[in-house]
């Protein structure tokens, strides 16, 4: 069997209204279309995947995100060009995201180029570009 990508990712957020305001701008910028917007859930699809935020139960909202705990470390969205990464950097800065690093190359694959930033809960999000098939060639 060979998988055909990641079908969807759900992220649990502490302040749903704040996170919805953030993701309802970010995800459409990334070409994703909203398909569900109900109390406690905001879900978009596009680029052969889905991405959703869900409200944390009240008793868990104070815990906060820590990428070094067991579980999620970060999420990376794949861009089609280096210029897309540069454009995304300007967009997320204007959105008020905490920038971890601006556009830069990294050793993960030949031509790997990315930005890294945080959502309102401190969940790290990356947007990268890798030319050609990258490590899959």
Q: What residue spans do the PLM features occupy?
A:
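Long, contiguous binding/interaction regions
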Residues: 7, 26, 30, 49, ...
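Residue-level marker for the onset of beta-strands and adjacent loop->beta junctions
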Residues: 38-40, 73, 113
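N-terminal beta-strand motif that seeds the catalytic metal site of vicinal oxygen chelate
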Residues: 1-20, 75, 131-137
